[in-house]
Amino acid sequence: MLFSKSLLLSVLASLSFAAPVEKREKTLTLDFDVKRISSKAKNVTVASSPGFRRNLRAASDAGVTISLENEYSFYLTTIEIGTPGQKLQVDVDTGSSDLWVPGQGTSSLYGTYDHTKSTSYKKDRSGFSISYGDGSSARGDWAQETVSIGGASITGLEFGDATSQDVGQGLLGIGLKGNEASAQSSNSFTYDNLPLKLKDQGLIDKAAYSLYLNSEDATSGSILFGGSDSSKYSGSLATLDLVNIDDEGDSTSGAVAFFVELEGIEAGSSSITKTTYPALLDSGTTLIYAPSSIASSIGREYGTYSYSYGGYVTSCDATGPDFKFSFNGKTITVPFSNLLFQNSEGDSECLVGVLSSGSNYYILGDAFLRSAYVYYDIDNSQVGIAQAKY
């Protein structure tokens, strides 16, 4: 039997409309600018304050005090806060969990916020306080506001309205609830921070996000809330369960930070360690921090100890093997050049960027994370990890 052309087209059209439509996940892309600053970081205590932005539960007197001028990176994204929106830039950090902004009466090169000019501001309570590993801090009030980020608007987002701060810019912490500054205060409480609010308000389907720092010389990177982007990594994502410890190495009833198990490190074909330790994946830390014996082993192999640095140094032109970090069968390769940090511009001597954590865990900062694509799955208390692709 012959079909007319019009009848055939009608049948095909009906079939196409009847075909199932694949549901696309709701995601939100947040771009950030990479800022590199060479500035004197005075009195940095190596063992007790790894990194430049690590949230501290309590200060420690242990460690070597050094004066280090170090080019470090931080990741600025633009937000609007309040009604009408006040635009400012904040530093994105996976190692802490709170949004806070420089408030009325403070100053910052990257913008400040004045709650008296907002009709959506709601003060919750006083007592906002957060401190970091470099000795900097911010204090003020807890409040709720409307915040626009990446083209999306979130209402009633809890944040710190800082009335005093010496950090330089506000911070957008996107870590776990248990690491919120409010959970560590005398009047302890927790709240739904940005990733959870994005899901609660239907802006993304999953409380999860992917971090892509881009290459060492790149000027921008991105976070994809709610999903992952397979074009930015090689192979598949290895799934890692989070380890239930806090940043002092103490066991907890649930995950409070993005600790995973690092099973070993190789340099070229040589094994550095096959002992498994927890490792914190922290974009707010610049270097890599390792258990003391491992950090010393790497330092001695590739540098000479310098008391003025408080660490091992080598020529900035030095070459070495790729470092391979093993996680549940997945290997992340980090070029040796990513581990060298110049003291100041023009110096011929570089710090080998693997220092002692003073604890039985690693902190894997930007020196590692630039080589990795990391999917932070808050809903399932897991992390996915793969080799980043540039």
Swiss-Prot record:
InterPro entries per record: Aspartic_peptidase_A1 (IPR001461), Aspartic_peptidase_AS (IPR001969), PEPTIDASE_A1 (IPR033121), Peptidase_aspartic_dom_sf (IPR021109), SAP-like (IPR033876)
Superkingdom of origin organism: Eukaryota
PANTHER family from the UniProt entry: ASPARTIC-TYPE ENDOPEPTIDASE, BETA-SITE APP-CLEAVING ENZYME, ISOFORM A-RELATED
One of the GO biological process terms: proteolysis
Protein's name according to its UniProt entry: Acid protease
Keyword Protease in record: yes
Domain Peptidase A1: 75-386
Secretion signal, residue range per the UniProt entry: 1-18
